[in-house]
Amino acid sequence: GSSGLIPMGRT
């Protein structure tokens, strides 16, 4: 997952 408002891969 990436850091940010929407951690893609951790949805």
Swiss-Prot record:
Family membership: Belongs to the periviscerokinin family.
Source domain of life: Eukaryota
InterPro entries with a match to the protein in the record: Periviscerokinin
Summary of the function given for this chain in its UniProt record: Mediates visceral muscle contractile activity (myotropic activity).
Cysteine-cysteine disulfides: none
Residue positions where Threonine amide is found in the record: T11
Organism of provenance: Panchlora viridis (Cockroach)
Protein name: Periviscerokinin-1
Tissue expression summary: Expressed in abdominal perisympathetic organs and abdominal ganglia.
Taxon lineage: Eukaryota, Metazoa, Ecdysozoa, Arthropoda, Hexapoda
Keywords: Amidation, Neuropeptide, Secreted
Compartment list: Secreted
Pfam families: Periviscerokin
GO cellular component, one term: extracellular region
GO annotation terms (biological process): neuropeptide signaling pathway
